[in-house]
Amino acid sequence: MGIKFRLIVMNFLQYAIWGSWLISLGAYLGGGLQFTGLQIGSFFATMGIASLFMPALMGIIADRWIPAQKLLGICQLISAGFLVAAASQTAYGPLYTCMLMSVMFYMPTIALSNSVAYNALDLAKLDAVKHFPPIRVWGTVGFIAAMWFVDLVQIGGVQIKLTYWQLYVSAILSLILAIYSFTCLLYTSPSPRDAHES
């Protein structure tokens, strides 16, 4: 499997995970669970909260102790676990907590996947400025494909986007990417200088 194809698959999955619920979650929360507009908005605010510090924290860990592709897999596993837990919740408090924790571990994976891609292209002696954009566009394709899937596919005569099944779809994709990260992505070592300084 060529390096560019591996990175295309990684980007496709990375953003398909997000596309499975980002656009449709509001329909489930408002329609299926009858949450208020303020409550629904708070779920989307979790991404901003997580982005304040989690990417930087995971970046430090990847730089010093754990290879980026391994940390990517670990974060995806944890995020998937919280998505599964979220799918079984119907009360605002527990569901919000599960989604917040899931997003806490998902948001850093965006930067981690970029780091893995740039490192892999560098190891393959490919110009990242030239080769990364066509790879990254497959992330957008993955997002749209997942969004269409939950919009169009029905379970028991009900669109997935109106049910908790969208969270299971996202969790399954997250698990697949975790396994893929552990088995198919090139090794990205922590910085020897940073590890020594720590």
Question: What kind of region is each of these model predictions?
Answer:
Residues 166-181:
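Symmetry-related core transmembrane helices of the 12-TM Major Facilitator Superfamily/SLC fold
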Residues 12, 93-109:
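Hydrophobic core of transmembrane alpha-helices in multi-pass small-molecule transporters
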Residues 187-198:
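Single conserved hydrophobic/aromatic residue that forms the stacking wall/gate
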Residues 2-48:
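Helix-loop boundary and gating motifs at the non-cytosolic
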Residues 54-66, 154:
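Helix-to-loop junctions at the C-terminal end of transmembrane segments
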Residues 106-135:
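Cytoplasmic helix-loop-helix junction between adjacent transmembrane helices
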Residues 70-83:
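Structural signature of the two symmetry-related core transmembrane helices
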Residues 48-52, 56, 144:
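Residue-level signature of mid-helix packing/kink "hotspots" within the transmembrane helices
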